[in-house]
Amino acid sequence: MRLPHVLQEQFLSLARPNTLKNIETCGILAGNLKNNVLTITTLILPKQTGTSDTCSTENEEDLFEFQNKHDLLTFGWIHTHPTQSCFLSSVDLHTHCSYQLMLPEAIAIVCSPSQTPNFGIFRLTDPPGLDIISTCRAERAFHTHPDKPIYTDASDTGFIEMINFDVNVVDLR
């Protein structure tokens, strides 16, 4: 998957007002498939609500309409952890599971501007992570999972290619 270097900087700039208020911000990573290569070309910030440790999209039909109009595929999502470290919480794992069930190559990016490391690109392991999360029936939002490698850093696997090109930014908030 090809990912623009400027994505993190542009997303954090848009998220900054929320980050300063300790509110998470999320976005959708969209792009195209060309010559068997997935390329993220567009960052879409949908209408959303957030708290210090959650972010939920709203009016998804606006997002789908924009993507359909511009022939954009969904390749994953990006969100901030305003004060927490760079990891996937149990809520994040369940959110990402739906993306990865639809597209096995889907990624989840976490930006933690106040921490080191401050940027991570993650995927559920398959197996066992995708199976564990997709069959989890815990009722509480934040909960524990078995102590197994449920997700991995996608940038360590050679799966992500950081390249030097611009990203289109669409703010639907």
List the predicted regions and their residue ranges.
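Conserved beta-strand-loop surface patch within small alpha/beta domains used
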Residues: M1-T74, T83-R173
